[in-house]
Amino acid sequence: YFISIKAKRIACVVSAVIFVATSCVSPLTGFAFWETNLAYEGESIYNYLQVKNLSDRTILSTNVLFGVQSVTMKDKGLTGMYYDTALAAPALADNANSALILGMGTGTYARQLKQYYPKMNITGVEIDQKITDLAGEYFDEPADIPVTTYDGRAWLAASHDKYDVIMVDAYQDITIPFQMSSTEFFTMVREHLNPGGVMVVNMNMISDGQGSINEALSDTIASVFGNG
């Protein structure tokens, strides 16, 4: 689902969009390490990595027995997963000229944006260099998109650039990096958005009840962007 949050305390209107990934109920996400059709299996400093070839797509899975971290379609089109929902972000923004992806992975968001918004300038940040290497080898990551190997929050702290869309896809499986879920982090994101810009956050867990992680994260974002 989407929650639109617009700031009331700043001159420009900034929208924040949160959506919950439903991929953990998809038949594609019952992922076990003993499955066949593995194109690659290995480890990086951060992750256990598997690349799996399916008939219509190639997927990357990390660390756990389920979940899809990244996907590329063998025939261009929508994925049928939460990545498609995120494509609404540029349509919600006042402009759709630039995008920053924090948690580039193997470039799923970037490929989708390139396909449906071909004139958009895209910048990627990915902390795991091995995933970036796999992106070029197995996932047809667009060669014209610059990808920096760095922590997303640290990258924001060092950058002065602003964007129409910022996609936060650094929440891996069921874990959330604390440094990218705080009031300070979302304040930095807001400061890097152009007027009328949109932030998208992927929360990879289905839980929206009282006291849930979703509720806590939504409250944190609302404290920065406002409730209106």
Feature annotation, model-predicted:
Residues S181-P195:
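A short glycine-rich, Lys/Arg-flanked "PGG" loop and its adjoining helix->strand segment in the class I
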Residues S212-G228:
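Conserved Class I S-adenosyl-L-methionine
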Residues G196-M203:
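Conserved beta-strand signature within the Rossmann-like core of class I S-adenosyl-L-methionine
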Residues L113, M188-R190, I221:
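Class I S-adenosylmethionine-dependent transferase superfamily signal
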Residues I3, V17-Y138, S212-L217:
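Class I S-adenosylmethionine
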Residues T132-H160, V165-V168, Q172-I174:
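S-adenosyl-L-methionine
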Residues Y1-S15:
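Cytosolic-side transmembrane helix boundary signature
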